[in-house]
């Protein structure tokens, strides 16, 4: 896709959001199946746009707003996502690799059968999100916030840095596999219903200065506490 074509689509989508032209419903941006690699989509309002199976490799989406968007099967490779805002978006079967999500916001989003690999996710917010069979491998997730999120089915945190994170009111952290991670300064000050359940093979895990209250560790083998 050329930059000129992209700008025309974005201009039409702005009319869709403003509802200021006749037949505005047909102006909605649908990028399904397109190659947006290397494109600049930063500082844009792309609410209600569709991005199924889109390639965002090397694209710039910094400080853009995506609400009620479909990212099914989307590919994010070396993508700039700093301070992006995702609200009620579907990331089923999507993949994030070597991408920057520093200070990004994800609220009420669905992450199913997808993966984050070698990403920078420091200070990222995942609030009221649903995770189902998600792999998080070799990521930097320091100072991230996972408040009020739900984990379904096995989710794996592998070889990642998880320092000083917030896990307030997480509902049922079930079937999580944590391997070769450093977990430091977890704070869970609320939620008497939070459950850390069935953590598998916690090799080389270090829990340092953790403040976890009202948690139940069921069928777990937690090692190397300091």
Residue map of PLM features:
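Tandem repeat scaffolds
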Residues: 4-8, 18-226
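Active-site environment of non-heme Fe oxygenases that use a 2-His-1-carboxylate facial triad
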Residues: 13
């Amino acid at each position: 896709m050329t930059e000129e074509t992209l700008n025309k689509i974005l201009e039409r989508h702005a009319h869709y959001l403003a509802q200021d032209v006749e037949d505005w419903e047909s102006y909605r941006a649908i990028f399904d199946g397109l190659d947006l690699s290397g494109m600049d989509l930063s500082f844009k309002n792309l609410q209600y746009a569709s991005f199924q199976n889109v390639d965002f490799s090397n694209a710039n989406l910094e400080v853009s707003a995506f609400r009620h968007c479909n990212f099914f099967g989307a590919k994010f490779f070396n993508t700039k996502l700093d301070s992006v805002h995702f609200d009620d978006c579907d990331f089923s079967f999507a993949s994030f690799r070597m991408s920057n999500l520093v200070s990004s916001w994800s609220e009420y989003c669905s992450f199913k059968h997808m993966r984050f690999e070698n990403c920078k996710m420091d200070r990222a917010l995942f609030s009221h999100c649903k995770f189902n069979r998600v792999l998080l491998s070799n990521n930097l997730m320091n100072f991230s916030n996972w408040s009020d999120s739900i984990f379904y089915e096995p989710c794996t945190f592998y070889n990642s840095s998880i320092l000083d994170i917030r896990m307030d009111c997480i509902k049922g952290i079930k079937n999580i596999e944590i391997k070769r991670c450093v977990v430091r300064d977890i704070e869970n000050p609320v939620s008497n219903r939070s459950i850390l359940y069935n953590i598998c093979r916690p090799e080389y895990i270090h829990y340092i200065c953790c403040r976890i209250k009202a948690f139940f560790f069921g069928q777990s083998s937690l090692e190397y506490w300091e």
